Each structure stands twice: as structure tokens, then as C-alpha cells.
Amino acid sequence: MDDKSKSQSFLKIESIRKRSYAHTVLLKENDVIVAFDNNLFFKGEKALIDDLIEQKKKEKKTLLTISRNEQLFDLIVIGSLGCDFISTDSEETEKIKQTFAKKQIWDKEELSNFFAMRDLTNNFEVIKDDKNISAGIFPPLWLAYHQKWSLMVIFSIVSFLLISVNFWVFLIGWICTSIYCYLAQKELLVSFSLLSGKAFSLIVASNNLENAEKCIRQLNPKSKFKYSNLQDPEPMISENDDNLVENKEEKNKISKTQEAIV
């Protein structure tokens, strides 16, 4: 690829170093860096590293737009990625530019990262990387919002027992629990999700939970969400399933023919 083509090419991740920041934010090989703070990025690998380091020195977050399997998503990062890159070819570059032209642009101050936790049957739980004041003011309400019903029941029973023993003991326990829930709410939700058999799958930046789920659905058409406005995806029939259906229909035809002969 000549220098002119390279200057109009995107950076594609060729490999991700172990324990790198890119590994932490769940980037994958063949992901393409499309835009830097909503501006198409053609400046090359060295410029990307320098710009990310400069942003970190200024304690500023960076909004990267990533292309994965021809789908775009945003990601907020704070630091250099730690990847090796190659350049996209002219055909891929043009296709991504056309896709980006149709993308809705959000100011990065409006966005937060959302962690997508997935189990083996594509059931997703989406956790916002931001603090919710309700966790510090009224923990049971926060637990109910995140559908942690068993924990809410346990918390309520313990609170009732404490208040029946001594009001001041209850008050001290409530304050300590509220502070802990507020400061460690993301870690708590991630831990609950891991205990339920889910694992980290994806991180996307979005302005709200609904749009985060839509973005995840685009990247993983099989994704299912509990208590969501999105309907569960229709079951995908594979080629083997098609053959099974055809064989079943053929057997039914043979059975009907045999019955008719009898």
C-alpha cells in the first residue's frame, strides 16, 4: 500500500498485547478505529498513541468509534490501547466511511460506558459504568431497579432485625451499607452477574440503557435482555436444522402415502 493510500486508511487491530488497555476494554483483533472524538481518524498509529497519551495527561476521556463486523459502536477510553495495527484497504475504508456518514453523532459528555455481561445462552445483563445516587440514599430501591430481588429481601430482613434490636444500631448499619453500595455499586453488580454465570462480553458507550441494548443487539443478533423493550430475537435456523425439517416433511409424505396405499 502506497503512502497516499495509507494516509486515507483506518487503523485495524492486528494483535492485542496481554494485559494491555485494549484487552481491558474488550477490543478484538480486526476491530477498526474509525473516529477520534467523532472525527474520522486517518493520522496513523503513532499519532493515535500520542493523542491518547496527551488526552490522559490532561485527564480527559476520549471517545473512539469502532467498526466490528461492519457495525459501528462508541467506546470511551482513558489511555493508549497497547495494540499493533495494520491499515485497511481502500474498499474496506470506503465502506466504513459510508457507514459512519449514516451514524448518529453524540457528544461524549452525554455518553457513559455500559458493560455487557453474557452467559452461554446469550442472556445479557447491561451495567452502566456510572454511579447512581439511589444506591447511596436507599439501597433497597437500587437493588429493586437492578432486579436483585433475593438480595433486597435479605437486606430488608436484616434491617428489620436490627431496628427491632436497637434503632441506633440499625441507623449505623444503614449508613455504612449505603456508603458501601454507593462507592462499590459497579463492582457489586459485576460480582452478582459473574456469580450468575455471566462473563464480560463487550463494552459500548451510549446515552442510555435502551440505546446500549440496541447497539449490543446489532453486534450480537442473538442477544436477549431481561425486562427490556427489545423483543427476543427470532430463533435462527441453521442449514442442519433446515435439513432436519426437510427430512421430517419427507417422512410425513411417505407415511401419508403408505396410509393411502393401505
Each model region followed by its residue ranges:
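Conserved PDZ fold ligand-binding element
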Residues: 22-45, 203-204, 208
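Transmembrane helix recognition focused on a "late"/terminal membrane span
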Residues: 2, 17, 28, 90-119, ...
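Membrane-cytosol interface at the C-terminal ends of transmembrane alpha helices
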Residues: 131-159, 172-196
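Hydrophobic beta-strand residues in large extracellular and virion-surface proteins
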Residues: 13, 27, 33, 64-66
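Short, surface-exposed alpha-helical recognition segments that flank or form part
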Residues: 127-129
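PDZ-domain C-terminal substructure recognizer with occasional recognition of PDZ-binding tails
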Residues: 1-6, 47-93
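PDZ/PDZ-like groove recognition
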Residues: 5-18, 22-23
